[in-house]
Amino acid sequence: MTVKIGVLALQGAVSEHIKALKDSGAETIAVKDASQLEELDGLVLPGGESTTMRRLMDKYGLFDAIKIFAKKKAIFGTCAGLILMAKEIEGRKGPHLGLLDIDVKRNAFGSQVDSFESDLKIDHVAESFDGVFIRAPYIKKVGPGVEILSTYNQHIVACRQGRFLACAFHPELTGDTRFHEYFVKITKENK
């Protein structure tokens, strides 16, 4: 069974996510308009700057459309996408998607110059996976029903809650498609 997964194309490594999804067996498109969501089985919210992405989602009518989409469909957030999916964001008030019962800290590992790579064990994905952290958040706290998939220095950096998957790093920048393959599997199970 083939699934169709969109990548929100407002900011971030859109083409890298599209390539990783295609290499993982999914049909995929760049999503720039809310009407495109209707044809999808899943959606990727890529990295970028979360405040800017939130503003662009509002500007293009995508925020409410994604909240409706999320009621039945799978979503995978990386870095800023994870932040957008969180119920709580440290130091931020106001509406966010609130899809994952998690509390996140933005830029938790430092600024752009503090970006790094680290070998990670990711449950259900890989014993060894190259995590690329760029101004990355981490998950401070998870609620019941949230499965912790990976940690780095005792900080949660990947999780799953039902059909929602999120990570603080950038798997699309590694050339390793195993994390995207896992999302394709989740999307198929949810179809």
UniProtKB/Swiss-Prot annotation:
Catalyses which reaction(s): aldehydo-D-ribose 5-phosphate + D-glyceraldehyde 3-phosphate + L-glutamine = pyridoxal 5'-phosphate + L-glutamate + phosphate + 3 H2O + H(+); L-glutamine + H2O = L-glutamate + NH4(+)
Pathway annotation from the record: Cofactor biosynthesis; pyridoxal 5'-phosphate biosynthesis
UniProt keyword Lyase present: yes
Catalytic activity, EC: 4.3.3.6, 3.5.1.2
CDD domains hit by this protein: GATase1_PB
Molecular function via GO: glutaminase activity; pyridoxal 5'-phosphate synthase (glutamine hydrolysing) activity
InterPro entries referenced in this protein's UniProt entry, alphabetically: Class_I_gatase-like, PdxT/SNO, PdxT/SNO_CS
Residue numbers annotated as active site: 79 (nucleophile), 170 (charge relay system), 172 (charge relay system)
GO CC, alphabetical: cytosol; glutaminase complex
Record key words, sorted: Glutamine amidotransferase, Hydrolase, Lyase, Pyridoxal phosphate
GO terms under biological process: glutamine catabolic process; pyridoxal phosphate biosynthetic process; pyridoxine metabolic process
Main function: Catalyzes the hydrolysis of glutamine to glutamate and ammonia as part of the biosynthesis of pyridoxal 5'-phosphate. The resulting ammonia molecule is channeled to the active site of PdxS.
Family according to the record: Belongs to the glutaminase PdxT/SNO family.
Alphabetical list of NCBIfam families matching this protein: PLP_synth_Pdx2
Subunit and partners: In the presence of PdxS, forms a dodecamer of heterodimers. Only shows activity in the heterodimer.
Record's protein name: Pyridoxal 5'-phosphate synthase subunit PdxT
Source species: Oenococcus oeni (strain ATCC BAA-331 / PSU-1)
Organism taxonomic ancestry: Bacteria, Bacillati, Bacillota, Bacilli, Lactobacillales
